Amino acid sequence: MDDYNKAVLGGIVKIASKMGISTIQSYQSSQIFEAVGISKDVIDKYFTGTVSRVGGIGLEDIQADVEALHNAAFDPLGLDINMQLEDGGAHKFRSGKEEHLFNPQTIHLFQKACFTGDYDTFKQFTHTVDNMGQNGVHLRSLLDFSYAPDGGIPLDEVEPVSSIVKRFKAAAMSYGALSSEAHETIAIALNRLGGRSNTGEGGEPEERYHSESNSKIKQVASARFGVTSKYLVSAEEIQIKLAQGAKPGEGGNLPGAKVYPWIAKTRHSTTGVGLISPPPHHDIYSIEDLAELIYDLKNANRHANINVKLVSEAGVGTIAAGVAKGGAQVILVSGYDGGTGAAPRNSIKDAGLPWELGIAETHQTLILNGLRTRVRIESDSKLLSGRDVAISCMLGAEEFGFGTSLLMTMGCVMMRVCNLDTCPMGICTQNPELRKHFHGKPEYIINYLTFVAQELREYMAKLGIRTIDELVGRTDLLHVKSAPADSRMSKMDLDCILHNPAIVNSNVHFQKEDTYDFHLEDTLDMKVLMKKFKLSSKTPQSVKLDVSNTDRAFGAIFGSEITRKYGSDLPDDVYTVHCTGAGGQSFGAFIPKGLTLELTGDCNDYMGKGLSGGKLVVRPPEGITFKPEENIIIGNVALYGATSGKAFVSGVAGERFCVRNSGAVAVVEGVGDHGCEYMTGGTVVVLGQTGKNFAAGMTGGIAYVLDENWDFYQRVNKETVSLEPVEHKYDVATLKELIREHVELTGSPRGKEILDDFSEFLPKFKKVLPYDYDHMLRVIASMEERGLDGEQAQIEAFYAVQKNK
């Protein structure tokens, strides 16, 4: 019973965490579940109020299933012969057990087709997966096409393969989850086709930005790994990952054993030290916050489309409407079947919903709100065949993502060890020895996606449809398959999926002329900075101007142009902007090295978001009567995801200061709750009080905190960090120099007071140091003492630490 209680409690805590629920009172009656495949009678009586949109089985079917499972588990005579339960094949394929789209037979057919370029073998594969299971394996298995009675149109009148494949994308799979060989192979293949690959949330090595292996879609997830100005300007599309189909509501956790030196470099973290992704984006707590991030990223790269990734769930249409109003140009609705092999099993099996429900709801809701022509809808999650793509398009999608299937083309054999770094095919591993086994080629992926487009064209010809745009939303060309009256299929009701609210025109899709206008030409960046600064000159220049809190993402556009021209090669302070007034949201977001923003006044939330080498200085106006160190001068979530650069703030910051900082240096005179949360690098100096939960999830970097009242230990989260006195000469010199620079730039009275009596204040400082980070730095230092250079020392230190675990 103790084990059972522990398991049940763990399950409740896990689900509450996914849903952002903190207390059991909020969990009770929250109705956060949706039923799929259960009849209305059962729902109304036993799960009153729970959403169940497609009907399904009744009590008699549930009873039959329970009895079958019981009989399989227990001897009919009650003898304790073998009490071990059989593996039902839910996770790994087992012959005669649960159906899997990829099983030994289908894997063989699929890989033979891709490796040899044999379209006939591919047709055998799609025939098998499209007709799998007595009752089907997807909601789309219950649908069929209503072909044109006149036989359709000639195939050569249908949109060509070369055009269709430009709508194909590689689903987001991170460099870190995939080996560099696999990640680059996917990017090269999609680039050659004219489609787009996706970096995933792990960043991308800079050397790939302007090569054939550049991923055209750059993802921005909650951890902001590798999100720099250079990363963003190299994109044709920027995707905001709000959730992941296979594990919605969960943040990632990359164990230290998988943070190889090259992964740490790309993610701006420390070799061998675990990385924690926050479950939410800490700059998104409302649809308005999401609109702000969309705006910020559009400023960071004016030429990129902004894509928002959602997960199929009840109400996703309402969220999508808000996303469309917020300016997104693409909305991805991801289904539960998308597959990170590293997700927990309960997430893989029991979280998220079929994309058929999400795509249909999103398409319908956008039509009803007059927003459908503003955005493209994208679907992904186990799209395998031309039939899958056709149905997805007919339910409302215009672009299509492929994930698991691309791994299969490169040799994946479904060992289900993606999370263990032991992939025998060199696909989902960073182990150099296992990566030698990688035999994937871009040509295999090109063969597969060409086959899908070719098969899609065949369906379109039979339907009498000439272009993809003509096919979007055409649910009138779908019907539910007939089924025996007593079968489970017959109990399903797919009317909600097939409903088309477009009364006048059944074919409503994206129209370029209706795209959201951000009015970037009206920003101060475009009207002032781009005109007054000579971008062609590296001679130090400065501009003075007034700002107000309506000037959002100030500096981001000009910063992006600096990055395009110079990368990160400029010295500090080449372009300096002296601002007066109230800085708007995301002041100085993503600004690169060479750009300095000095603000005399105060600043709103998200200051220095994604700081990429630039410098920020905030100070109160002269002649103030209050003490800066006792008053808030910048808002919440400053320096979120900063990767490099400096920030000096003469005053107090709001909550979540430097959350996910991975390389910036900051000096501030007080912070709110959750300071330095999930930090993985950089240095933070706090010359005053902190709020509670300081350093929660912090796995890298160093913080120096002034603890005048000797009570800081009560407000720090000591799960991953230690508190130490500042005694080492390097620490003392670093701290003193940063305070000196802070005083020089801001004129801080508090900083000057500390410097004038530094020996008195020094014992009151605490050094916040993550355990794993400290250990790894010591091992690296010992390797360098043996004569190894920096990179080789990191590699040897990584293997030494893993060997001793």
Walk through the language-model features, giving the residues of each:
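Generic, well-ordered alpha-helical scaffold segments in large soluble proteins
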Residues: 7, 11-18, 27-30, 46, ...
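Hydrophobic alpha-helical scaffolding
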Residues: 1-6, 14-17, 96-100, 112-115, ...
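Long, distal/terminal scaffolding or interaction modules
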Residues: 434-435, 446, 459-463, 472-475, ...
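Alpha/beta enzyme core
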Residues: 13, 24-25, 38-46, 227, ...
